[in-house]
């Protein structure tokens, strides 16, 4: 399998033979990218990049198309960063592919790019195009490429996302973490049953002959080297850990990520860890919610009391913790409870494999054979039905029965949203309010129209229009949540509300949540405002008076 990389490769080792290395501008420190170029601003080649030529798989070898692939979110490269983040949040993904005016793949942007290239640089997401910060001409694979080779390349290169192309079109996005979780689960289960070791031994014996001495001792050595070492063996004194205070703004956290080239920061109070903030949190909880990184404090959007591991925790236990919790970053504490490091699943897995591959001679060759056997076993694992629709945080909520995960809140899409309504004088008000509290929303509305929120009789009914054109009353917190969820799913930046002050609407039962569709004339009357009610009532009164006068004159 060959891959494409027309821009400079990242310092993480992601490169191909066609890579052209270019030095960064002297005036600006390069920002490491996940896929392809360093700064994401390399020029596009004049001619179309060559399609990667896939190695023909032999019988029995799995291809990329048989891996757990996710449907790729593809947007035009002229989209703003804010809109891209909003769409990623709606899809609960942390990467999207970009296309040019010819609908061809031109780049990829990830949560790390948003944090380190936009927020850390002080750029405004609503005024910055993704084409300015994306990684151009990303490396990709064809759907018939060897799965094992693709996975090993991603682990060695330490990158997560890989576009999958079939017949010249992007069909999916490969997220290595999902495959790693499968591998971890499979290897742990197989190790307990002994089947993986037996299969590996069988493969070694076929290749090296049954006369190889002490295979059991070799296997034990392999297990000792790969699974049993403590995290302290892969964490050096120079390990980078980004620390911020709870009162620091998100912009400061993003700059720490950029400067240390990490994807997360630890929030510490004194010497104790009180939270963690990742680049995905910045995308989902800050940018997608249109919050100001300079004014939003870290403590408002961090994950409090994260699960931690000690330096004595084994590599296997650390992987198991992250696998069970479906999260990607794990803070490491020393014996005093202070933050020693923060590792991600790719770092740990890469370190574990490196321990095996750093062996010498025949031991190294057989170790590689063993690793391939383990990968093959992992690839044969059937994924859960709903795996591709879960994010790392939503999965934790689905596994709420695991007590140690109770400290992690649902990532969600934030607890606020933008609303808009027109008051009695025809003025339009736009504001941000909690997306789960109707009382809070009503209070803001009443304040904007200059009425007393404590006077229930003066409160209007709040109505919105759903995706089918029906007029729906918001009478409870759950109604509000449903309205906001619908707005987000349809890509709306703001939910337009309609206020109804009429007595007929106010007398409706609170259990009534939807008004049926009428004809076009009735549809207009369904949005009757207070002013419209006065006009209609006045017309009825005047008509009645006119009839009375006419009857009196006729009688006379």
Curated annotation (Swiss-Prot):
GO cellular component: membrane
Residues bearing PTM N-acetylserine: 2
Polar residues bias (residue ranges): 1-20, 30-44
Location of region: Disordered: 1-63
Keywords annotated in UniProt: Acetylation, CBS domain, Membrane, Repeat, Transmembrane, Transmembrane helix
Membrane topology designation: Single-pass membrane protein
Localization, UniProt: Membrane
Protein name per its UniProtKB record: CBS domain-containing protein CBSCBSPB3
């Amino acid at each position: 399998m060959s891959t494409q990389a027309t821009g400079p490769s990242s310092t993480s080792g992601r490169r191909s033979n066609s890579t052209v290395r270019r030095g960064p501008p002297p005036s600006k420190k390069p920002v490491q990218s996940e896929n392809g170029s360093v700064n994401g601003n390399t020029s596009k080649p004049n001619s179309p990049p060559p399609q990667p030529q896939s190695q023909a798989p032999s019988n029995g070898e799995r291809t990329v198309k048989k891996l757990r692939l996710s449907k790729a979110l593809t947007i035009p490269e002229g989209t703003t960063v804010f809109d891209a983040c909003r769409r990623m949040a709606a899809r609960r993904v942390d990467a999207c592919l970009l296309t040019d005016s010819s609908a061809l793949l031109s780049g990829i942007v990830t949560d790390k790019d948003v944090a380190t290239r936009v927020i850390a640089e002080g750029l405004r997401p609503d005024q910055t195009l993704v084409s300015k910060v994306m990684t151009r001409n990303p490396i990709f694979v064809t759907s018939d490429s060897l799965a094992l080779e693709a996975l090993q390349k991603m682990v060695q290169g330490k990158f997560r996302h890989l576009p999958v192309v079939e017949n010249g079109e992007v069909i999916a996005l490969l997220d290595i973490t999902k495959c790693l979780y499968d591998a971890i689960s499979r290897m742990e289960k197989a190790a307990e049953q002994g089947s993986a070791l037996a299969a590996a031994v069988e493969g070694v014996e076929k290749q090296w002959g049954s006369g190889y001495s002490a295979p059991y001792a070799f296997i034990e050595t392999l297990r000792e080297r790969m699974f049993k070492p403590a995290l302290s063996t892969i964490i050096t004194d120079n390990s980078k850990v980004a620390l911020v205070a709870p009162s620091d703004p998100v912009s400061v956290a993003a700059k720490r990520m950029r400067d240390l080239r990490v994807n997360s920061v630890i929030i510490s109070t004194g010497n104790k860890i009180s939270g963690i903030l990742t680049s995905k949190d910045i995308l989902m909880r800050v940018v997608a919610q249109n919050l100001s990184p300079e004014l939003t404090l870290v403590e408002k959007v961090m994950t409090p009391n994260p699960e931690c591991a000690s330096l004595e925790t084994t590599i296997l236990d650390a992987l198991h913790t992250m696998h069970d919790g479906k999260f990607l970053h794990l803070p490491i504490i020393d014996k005093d409870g202070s933050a020693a490091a923060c590792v991600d699943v790719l770092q740990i897995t890469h370190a574990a494999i490196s321990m095996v591959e750093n062996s010498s001679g025949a031991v190294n060759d057989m170790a590689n054979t063993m690793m391939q056997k383990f990968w093959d076993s992992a690839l044969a694992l059937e994924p859960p039905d709903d795996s591709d629709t879960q994010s790392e945080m939503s999965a934790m909520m689905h596994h709420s029965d695991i007590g140690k995960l109770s400290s992690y809140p649902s990532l969600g899409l934030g607890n606020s949203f933008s609303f808009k309504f027109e008051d009695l004088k025809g003025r339009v008000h736009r504001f941000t309010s909690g997306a789960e509290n109707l009382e809070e929303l009503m209070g803001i509305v009443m304040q904007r129209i200059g009425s007393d929120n404590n006077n229930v009789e003066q409160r209007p009914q709040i109505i919105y229009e759903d995706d089918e054109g029906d007029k729906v009353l918001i009478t409870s917190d759950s109604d509000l949540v449903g309205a906001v969820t619908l707005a987000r799913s349809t890509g709306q930046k703001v939910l337009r509300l309609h206020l109804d002050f009429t007595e007929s609407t106010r007398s409706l039962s609170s259990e009534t949540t939807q008004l049926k569709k009428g004809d076009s004339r009735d549809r207009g009357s369904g949005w009757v405002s207070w002013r419209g009610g006065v006009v209609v009532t006045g017309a009825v009164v005047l008509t009645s008076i006119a009839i009375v006068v006419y009857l009196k004159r006729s009688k006379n």
